[in-house]
Amino acid sequence: MVKALLSLTRPANLVTAIADVLAGIAIAGYFIPHNPAPAPVGWLALATVCLYGGGVVFNDVFDAELDAVERPERPIPSGMVSIRLATSLGAILLLIGIGASFMVNQTAGGLAISIAISSLVYDRFGKHHNWLGPVNMGLCRGLNLLLGVSILPDQVGSWAWIGIVPIVYIAAITMISRGEVHGGSVTTLRAAGLLYALVIGCVAALAQRQQQLGTAFPFLLLFGYFIFPPLWRAVKEPTGRNIGLAVRAGVLSLIVMNAAWVAAFAYFPLALLVFCLLPLSRLLAKVFAVT
């Protein structure tokens, strides 16, 4: 039962959400004094884990009937977890996430509410739309990055536009994932590859603007190394398995992208620490489903 409940929250993905928040905190400049108070960082880490976990639990709740046909091994259709229990778990996680955010400040709390609403809209409606769905999912990640920025509320307005970058990246992954069950479109996969390249270019440009391109470059190189080969294999053979591997690589590589953000806006040792979340996420991905 415990493993089934954990599986609903996609533990490997939760680690990537923490990396989002750490990247946002770095963008806000919170780490620059080298003596930041740890409590707000801890509250935001708890908040993002609960918000992400609650969102994906509700994804399975709303998909219960479809999963009974396409993924009968999932916790709800297999009978390991009831819809009622899953709904309660999702609601509790979202409420904890919102509450933890308000422990930091009202701006963080407001963003947490926005994340919860955006994730529920995606789970219930957005994912059924070809273009709205990817943008909606990306919005959740963009807001999550800004949740980190909100550790210094006065920085949110200045950096709100930077949330567009994860929106584009997650939109690309969501486009790819549409073919995970029955196989995908080569045209869609190639378009996603162009969006990947655009994201790398944007992060590199911002790193250069911060005069930190040299620090961020190793992480950008690794980022490309992790995301492009699986995508290229899916382009050559767009089967459900190859597309699933491309999606998994894209999701887990969010940690590498976030390490690049930290390298661009903070300093290399902290970026390396964020990068070290990747082995943990990959280990969890061997035990729990990523998608």
For the regions a protein language model found, what residue spans apply to each?
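C-terminal membrane-associated helical module and adjoining short loops/tails
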Residues: 2-6, 14-15, 142-145, 150-291
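Short, amphipathic, aromatic/basic-enriched membrane-interface segments that mark the entry/exit
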Residues: 7-12, 60, 76-86, 103-108, ...
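Membrane-embedded alpha-helical segments that form the functional core of polytopic membrane enzymes
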Residues: 17-62, 94-102, 106-122, 160-172, ...
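Short helix-capping/hinge motifs at transmembrane helix termini and TM-loop junctions
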Residues: 28-32, 104-105, 126-127, 151-152, ...
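Membrane-helix interfacial "entry" motifs
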Residues: 32-40, 104, 126-130, 154-158, ...
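Multi-pass membrane catalytic core of lipid/isoprenoid biosynthesis enzymes
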Residues: 42-48, 64-119, 138-140, 144-148, ...
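Acidic (Asp/Glu-rich) catalytic motifs at the cytosolic membrane interface
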Residues: 47-85, 173-186, 284-289
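Catalytic beta-strand/loop module used to bind and position nucleotide/cofactor moieties
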Residues: 120-123, 131-134, 138, 142, ...
